[in-house]
Each structure stands twice: as C-alpha cells, then as structure tokens.
Curated annotation (Swiss-Prot):
Entry function: Binds directly to 16S ribosomal RNA.
GO cellular component, one term: cytosol
Molecular function per GO: small ribosomal subunit rRNA binding; structural constituent of ribosome
Gene Ontology BP annotations: translation
Gene that produces this protein: rpsT
Coiled coil: none
Family assignment from sequence similarity: Belongs to the bacterial ribosomal protein bS20 family.
Organism the protein comes from: Clostridium botulinum (strain Alaska E43 / Type E3)
Domain of life of the native organism: Bacteria
SUPFAM superfamilies the UniProt entry points to: Ribosomal protein S20 (SSF46992)
Matches recorded under PANTHER family: 30S RIBOSOMAL PROTEIN S20, SMALL RIBOSOMAL SUBUNIT PROTEIN BS20C
Gene3D superfamilies in alphabetical order: Ribosomal protein S20
Protein name: Small ribosomal subunit protein bS20
Pfam family, any one: Ribosomal_S20p
Amino acid sequence: MANIKSAKKRIKVTETKTLNNRMVKSALKTVIKKFEAAVAGNNVEEAKTAFVAVTKSLDVAASKGVVHKNMAARKKSRLAAKLNAMA
C-alpha cells in the first residue's frame, strides 16, 4: 500500500483510467464482432455500415491512446480487405 500522498492519487487515477480503457476496448471488440457477423452472413449493406462504425471506433481508441495507432491501422486494413472481398 502506498504511503505517499501522490502515490495514493496515482493509484486512484490508474484505476479510473483502467476502467475507461476497458470500456473503450470492450465497445471496440463488440463493433468488430458485429462487422465480422455481417461479413459471415454475406450482408454487404450491413457490413458497410458496420465498417464505418469500426473505423470510427478504432480512430477514437487510437487517438485516446487506448490502442496503438499502428494496431488500429492494421485492423482497419484487414477489415477493409474482408469487405472488399465480399463486393
């Protein structure tokens, strides 16, 4: 357990940021699963709208520092390839 006041504050801040990051990552995974389901079901229109949502979510997560920007770019690229393979 921390004894110094600033260390105690850092523990609180870390817990808060951990919860926020977990929420963003969970939402991101949910949106990606929705896109994957649309691709698996050969639903092109639904896949296109889901892809826009995935792209936006990845950009937000990358800008907030929740995920690395290269990881976001890689995911977007791979998901775009899946979308283009459908059409």
